Regions:
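Intrinsically disordered, low-complexity segments enriched in polar/charged small residues
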Residues: 7-8, 95
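Kelch-like beta-propeller repeat domains
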Residues: 21-348
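Bacterial N-terminal signal peptides
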Residues: 8-16
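Bacterial N-terminal signal peptides that target proteins for export
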Residues: 1-7
Length: 348
């Protein structure tokens, strides 16, 4: 894109958002509040998607299959997309955009008795704005990390299977509609972890691991890992353990890769693992973090972007990179209320 055209477009985007304070722009809120939703972006962050999740009641019958879409190059307003096929909405699904398609993977369904069932479904939202069915996930998971490499390979990392947390790295080839298994991360199997992918590099942090026999079902993990993807073999990953990241959050952090900045950005989350209602597995109140931090891939170090970011959030469905900066779509606020807000994160 030519520079004058890009600057004009950037200005038009700036005028499409309202202002929060003196210099912090704010995106329009979604038509409905959702948490544990899956989010994705296309066209370099100009098209944003929020899919499924749970509404303000946070009950099994408030789980939705609705899709909300915003085209930043048009009116910069949210509108309803084609709902995700299926008899029930899902929670904790993962999504990524590649080849002008949104790939929606896994998640779990909840019934009236409170049972949670992880599903293998892969749904692909194509340019014609209809859903196609992709090949099922070999190891179905929920609350995993996903990211895209070379606009073709979608990496699904960790998550909770029917047998508990896993350390699998599963790779979906968008061109071939096929799955393969990549080098698993060598750390403790976890779900509710956070991370992203940029510049052939995966960074993942924290999550929940299986708890002790006489304690809560899940406890927090503090492990951080970096994986370098082989340039010739997308299934080969060289993993390295990283030092602890800034902040205290360990579960439900929003994360995502920024190819523009060569960083993986993280925001919010809680100190202890929790369910989709925001209730900790150990029965204690979960403290929501307001820290925004990032891993700088080029310089290979952590950096704190803000110790007191506005609109602290948990279960926000990941971070999407836009031309105005990274955004978090939906989730639960610090009072555990489900929100429709779209928060533009600070940049260092």
């Amino acid at each position: 894109m030519r520079r004058p055209l890009f600057l004009a477009l950037l200005l038009s985007l700036s005028l499409c958002v309202t202002t929060l304070g003196e210099d912090q722009p704010q995106f329009p809120s979604m038509p409905a509040a959702v948490s544990s939703n899956a989010t994705a972006s296309l066209k370099g962050g100009f098209d944003l998607f929020s899919m499924m999740g749970v509404g303000p009641k946070k009950t099994w019958d408030d789980v939705t299959n609705q899709v909300y879409v915003m085209h930043l190059t048009h009116s910069a307003k949210w509108h309803q997309g084609q709902p995700v096929p299926g008899v029930a909405g899902r929670l904790g699904a993962s999504a990524s955009g590649a080849k002008a398609q949104v790939v929606l993977m896994g998640g779990y369904v909840v019934d009236a008795q409170g049972s949670e069932i992880t599903v293998p479904d892969v749904n692909v939202y194509v340019e014609q704005r209809r859903w196609n069915r992709g090949k099922d996930i070999p190891v179905p998971v929920d609350r995993a990390v996903s990211g895209v490499n070379h606009d073709r390979f979608v990496y699904l990392i960790g998550g909770r299977s029917k047998n508990g947390p896993v350390n699998n790295v599963q790779v979906y080839d968008v061109e071939k509609d096929s799955w393969s298994q990549a080098t698993p991360f060598p750390g403790t199997p976890v779900f509710g972890l956070s991370g992203g992918l940029a510049d052939d590099t995966i960074v993942i942090v924290d999550g929940a691991k299986a708890g002790p026999a006489e304690g809560p079902s899940y406890v927090a993990s503090d492990e951080c890992w970096m994986g370098k993807i082989d340039k010739k073999n997308p299934e080969k990953i060289e993993w390295t353990k990283l030092p602890a990241h800034p902040g205290t959050a360990r579960f439900g952090i929003a994360g995502g890769g920024s190819g523009r900045d060569r960083k993986i950005v993280f925001f919010g989350g809680t100190t202890t693992p929790h369910d989709y209602k925001g209730v900790s597995y150990d029965g204690k109140p979960a403290e929501v973090s307001s820290v925004t931090f990032a891993f700088d891939i080029h310089h290979s170090h952590w950096e704190t972007i803000s110790d007191n970011s506005p609109e602290a959030r948990l279960d926000g469905g990941g971070i999407q990179d836009t031309v105005l900066g990274p955004v978090v779509i939906g989730g639960m606020a610090s009072n555990r209320g489900v929100t429709a807000r779209v928060t533009l994160l600070p940049k260092k």
